[in-house]
């Protein structure tokens, strides 16, 4: 899969000329950097908004149509979204930190904006943890679908094969329609596979810094050498996302032309990406997220495609919320439809199968098999990318805290 790097290489190459030099950043140069950053954001999300469309069904068979994997919310698309986030984050960090006097980001309004951004990053870590756990549930759905496919591919197709497929399909359909908390926390009804979100955690280490400077972003610098992250039983994705949007407002006046602007953009991108992930897979307590995610003003050019993606996903989420859904991942949505259709075939099956019904079912089984194949290839790499996002956020947060500590030492009075 081609990373969504765009012009990042040339941008970072040029900006790194100022690496390790504490100089006054030229205003004209900074404006050019900010404009490039906004352009790259717009370009990357435009590509995500308009993925290649599958060919008309009259030109290719159904299975080949399913192979067009880059639709919004497909596993392949979600992997591209992770690449986009990582590219945006790297470019933003270059703007924020490279060659900048550390005391600059400790002064107003950054003494407020930076801690708020660091606090959002902590909440994003929780969401990454929950989403990786949710993908484990999706892999369980995949296994149920594979059982049904294997049974229905047998020739000649007998009553025993159909009964085996029917049991797997029944569990699959129930799992895919469970409400969020049931699906992720409970693991009941054959849907969650005993997945215990409350027991999953990651640990990460930070270098110990000085003991004097403190961060309003959630931790004293150097206070903890390691932290453990786990999603509790009463944890709520909706509350987490809403908390991330607190105080997330576009900069005004002079701030709109300076560093607060990319800070707002990156925070918006982070919240949006976490919102998409919670929509895609089983995740605890998502009630209301389809309607209440704040989006940036439409007059901002960099935000147009992001808003377009938000609207597409939000509309689909509202439909699914009414009847209950484990997630909006494209493969899961298609799997649910095929599961219902194959259940109808199994309910009406009598040996020997009617020719037309058997042929129609065979096409659907082949499509289900293709979905399972894609999941087998893509779900684990998606989990790995989300872990990479997690650790990138951890590293960037530590680097920003380090810069704040340096600023504290520089500004401390000499005794």
UniProtKB/Swiss-Prot annotation:
One of its GO terms (cellular component) is cytosol. InterPro entries: ROH1-like. Disruption phenotype: Reduced pectin deposition leading to reduced seed coat mucilage thickness. Characteristic pattern of pectin deposition to the corners of seed coat volcano cells. Residues 184-219 are annotated as: Disordered. Its main location: membrane. Residues 185-195 have a biased composition (Gly residues). GO terms for biological process: mucilage biosynthetic process involved in seed coat development; seed coat development. Mainly expressed in cells expanding in a polar manner such as pollen and root hairs. Residues 200-219 have a biased composition (Low complexity). The chain crosses the membrane at residues 263-283. Keywords: Cytoplasm, Developmental protein, Membrane, Transmembrane, Transmembrane helix. Interacts with EXO70A1 and EXO70C1. Binds to EXO70C2. Belongs to the ROH1 family. Required for seed coat mucilage deposition. This is Protein ROH1A. It comes from Arabidopsis thaliana (Mouse-ear cress). The lineage of its organism: Eukaryota, Viridiplantae, Streptophyta, Embryophyta, Tracheophyta. The gene is ROH1A.
């Amino acid at each position: 899969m081609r990373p969504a790097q765009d012009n990042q290489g040339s941008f970072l190459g040029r900006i790194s000329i100022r690496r390790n030099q504490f100089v006054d950043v030229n205003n004209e140069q900074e404006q050019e950097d900010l404009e490039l950053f906004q352009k790259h954001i717009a370009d990357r999300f435009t590509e995500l908004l308009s993925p290649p469309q599958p060919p008309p069904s009259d030109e290719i068979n159904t299975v080949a149509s399913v192979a067009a994997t880059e639709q919004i919310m497909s596993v392949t698309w979600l992997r591209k979204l992770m690449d986009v986030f990582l590219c945006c984050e790297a470019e933003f960090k270059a703007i924020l930190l490279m060659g900048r006097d550390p005391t600059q980001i400790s002064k107003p309004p950054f003494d407020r904006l930076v801690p708020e951004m660091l606090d959002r990053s902590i909440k994003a870590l929780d969401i990454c943890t929950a989403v990786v756990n949710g993908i484990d549930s999706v892999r369980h759905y995949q296994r149920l679908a594979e059982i049904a496919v294997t049974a229905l591919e047998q020739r000649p197709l007998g009553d025993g094969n159909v009964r085996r497929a029917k049991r797997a399909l029944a569990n699959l359909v129930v799992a895919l329609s469970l409400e969020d908390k049931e699906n992720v926390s409970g693991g009941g009804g054959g849907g969650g596979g005993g997945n215990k979100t409350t027991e999953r955690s990651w640990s990460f280490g930070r270098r110990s810094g000085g003991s004097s400077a403190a961060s309003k972003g959630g931790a004293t610098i150097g206070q903890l050498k390691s932290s453990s992250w786990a999603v509790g039983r009463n944890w709520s994705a909706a509350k987490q996302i809403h908390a991330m949007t607190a105080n997330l407002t576009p900069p005004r006046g002079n701030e709109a032309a300076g560093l607060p602007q990319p800070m707002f953009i990156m925070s918006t991108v982070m919240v949006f990406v976490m919102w998409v992930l919670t929509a895609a897979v089983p995740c605890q307590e998502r009630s209301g997220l389809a309607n209440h995610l704040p989006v940036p003003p439409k007059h901002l050019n960099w935000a147009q495609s992001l808003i377009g993606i938000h609207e597409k996903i939000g509309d689909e989420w509202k439909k699914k919320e009414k009847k209950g859904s484990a997630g909006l991942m494209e493969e899961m949505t298609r799997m649910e439809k095929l599961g219902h259709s194959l259940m109808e075939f199994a309910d009406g099956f009598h040996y020997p199968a009617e020719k037309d019904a058997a042929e129609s079912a065979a096409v659907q089984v082949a499509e289900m098999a293709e979905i399972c194949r894609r999941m087998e290839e893509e779900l684990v790499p998606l989990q790995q990318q989300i872990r990479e996002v997690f650790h990138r956020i951890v590293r960037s947060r530590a680097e920003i805290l380090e810069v704040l500590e340096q600023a504290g030492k520089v500004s401390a009075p000499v005794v």
